[in-house]
A protein has these predicted regions:
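Short, glycine/acidic-rich beta->alpha junctions
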Residues: 4, 37-41
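Short strand-turn-strand beta-turns centered on an Asx-Gly dipeptide
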Residues: 17-38
Length: 304
């Protein structure tokens, strides 16, 4: 049986050097590469962003600032792999995207110009009757450099809520009033969380994270309620830690960071990091919690 029909665990291996870039899965920036003067390597799980049929991966290299020159050594390598939750020792590579500043045409060094078929029941070997289809890359250099790839990989994961949610506006182009309307709506939800945490009432807010917690349990084959319990313990640890203090703020300190697919939006502070912040007392640093929202039928839902 194909591991895709069991309990697949998808991950991205990201290796980069002398470059700044976003890594994108299905219209969501799942990782930011900031290796502008050195190398980095990381592997991240992506089940909670994956679709059960068709998925899109991308590398978006930051555009150059005026007067800035890109190092000829700039590279990004992105590899999608899968393993079974029941047998994690065997990992299989499915698709790859690569960026090399030293070469002009990413299409030329990113594999075939025709779809490639892989067989998930035969160690993802290339076969004409394969059930996995890796499409050629698409390159867009209108703003920075974007290299994306479509992958048809039928699997047993459910359709996550954000795939079917309302399209969000382009927050970089809408009016100030429309932007403020959505920001204020998310701030009201944030404020409920902040007020509860300020008095240590963690149980009062866990239901706001119901979709996030439930879908995380499903994505990684956890027991029902495990992610909820983990979030509760993390909040309690922060609330009871005498070395950190909840940062309470009015709405002017916050903003919106939309995901490129316009299905999710992050509610962030002015430093572009997670909205819920516990600052260390007497020293720099903080403990942060992300708030990532979607909208369905007019209702804002914490999705991730």
């Amino acid at each position: 049986m194909s591991i895709l029909n069991g309990k697949p665990l998808f991950s991205l291996s990201i290796k980069a050097s002398d470059v700044r870039a976003f890594i994108e899965v299905n219209g969501i920036y799942v990782h930011t590469v900031n290796s502008s003067s050195g190398s980095s390597s990381v592997e991240i799980p992506v089940n909670h962003y994956f679709h059960p049929e068709t998925n899109y991966l991308g590398v978006v290299v930051f555009p150059l600032a005026e007067g800035e020159k890109r190092s000829a050594k700039s590279t990004v390598n992105l590899t999608l792999s899968v393993k079974s939750d029941e047998n994690p020792n065997n990992k299989y590579d499915i698709a790859e995207i690569e960026y090399r500043a030293s070469q002009d045409d990413p299409s030329g060094y990113n594999g075939s110009n025709s779809p490639v078929f892989l067989s998930s029941i035969d160690a993802f070997a290339e076969k004409d009757e394969g059930d996995v289809v890796v499409h050629p890359v698409v390159v867009d250099d209108s703003e920075g450099i974007s290299i994306s790839r479509k992958i048809e990989v039928p699997n047993s994961l459910p359709v996550w809520g954000f795939f079917e949610s309302d399209d969000l506006p382009d927050y970089f182009r809408i009016s100030k009033d429309d932007y403020a309307r959505d920001k204020d709506a998310l701030y009201e939800i944030y404020k409920v969380i902040e007020q509860s945490l300020s008095v240590g009432e963690v149980d009062e807010i866990l239901d706001l994270f119901e979709e996030r917690n439930r879908e995380t349990d499903q994505a990684f084959y956890l027991d029902q309620g495990e992610t909820r319990d983990s979030l509760k313990q993390s909040f309690l640890s922060s609330v009871n830690n005498e070395n950190i203090q909840l940062l309470e703020s009015d709405s002017i300190k916050f903003g919106l960071r939309p995901e490129p697919g316009r299905k999710l939006v992050r509610f962030i502070r002015a430093d572009r990091r997670g909205a819920i912040a516990f600052n260390f007392i007497g020293e720099e640093g903080s403990v942060r919690y992300d708030l990532v929202f979607r909208k369905q039928d007019g209702e804002w839902i914490i999705s991730r």
